[in-house]
Amino acid sequence: MSDRAYKRWSCGLLLTLLLVLGACAAVVYWVDPCFYYRMPKDRAPVFFSERYQTAGIVRNNAADVVLLGSSMTANYRGSKVGAVFGGTGLRLTIPDGYYSEFDEVMTLLMRTHPPERVLFALDANILTRSPAGVTGAMPDYLYDDDSLNDARYLLNKDTLYYSLYALMSQRWNAGETLDTGFMWDDTVWWNHMEALDEYERPEIAAVSMPAGALLADTAENLAVVTNWATRYPDVEFDLFFSPYSILYWDKIDRMGETDAVFAALELACKTLLPYENITLHGLLFDRDIIEQLDYYCDYVHHSAEAGELVLAKLSSGADRLTEENYRKTLANWRDFVVNYDYEKFWDEHYWYQFHTPNNS
């Protein structure tokens, strides 16, 4: 091949490549599957990945009250949050999220549309685990303020795939509203039988976990939250220990982790309560919720119905923890859970009360 022919071939190949890349970028920009530029106006949005789409939801939806959490908050409606606390509400979910991931969401939220109030779910399982376990699942380039990252969004095989997926889903009328996006309340059975069936009861541990075993990781996670309170003094933070079911307490008791978990919860109270713009709520200790297994589909996740009860209790302050009452609250709750009759859930009488016909 002559030099001239080679140059023509190279230029043709380069032009073809640029045209293909341009076409891909145009498709991604037009569909905008992650709502990076806008929320769709002419079609219902398609929700498929919380980590990819939360950044766009934050960028393009201002709200007075924002609920942020893991999958524990997935079945709350933003409209309910707004109705309870006043103003507009928005729910943001990062399933099995790490605190570094929540921090990315919070930073973007405060940079774009800072709300008056943030509700944040403190999941005991996530609060006490090592931050070092975080994966690379979070697309950081969608959350930063570097405009050069537009290219990473537009010229990305994942977002191109998501664009095609969104187009096909819209053809199948699979779009949802922002209020219901990522909700799965109607996909499972909320019932005591389901909760118990999904609960894998551990064997009793031969040795208990040391009381201080979870403190270092808990302190590192709490530092993320206290940094929010310091950086955003004009924002009210309503933090709450997520209401895992009573089966959670059976699990940590059998695993020998009771002392370690209570030490971590005490550290959380000591750390968070001194901040004037933080209010802390002990929903994890609320018997109205956690003992009602019909609210659950496993040992931790609760229904939208229970979520509405959580919002009402947050608003009323029914389970509020203070520097004056948290020690007594934790002591009383520890006494309650270590002496609880967990075996009743596997007793025939427990099942008969639900499944024996009333012949009276």
Where are these regions (language model features)?
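Membrane-embedded segments
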Residues: 62, 68, 72-152
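Conserved, well-ordered alpha-helix/loop/beta-strand core segments that scaffold catalytic motifs
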Residues: 193-275
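Alpha-helical transmembrane signal-anchor/signal-peptide segments
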Residues: 30-51
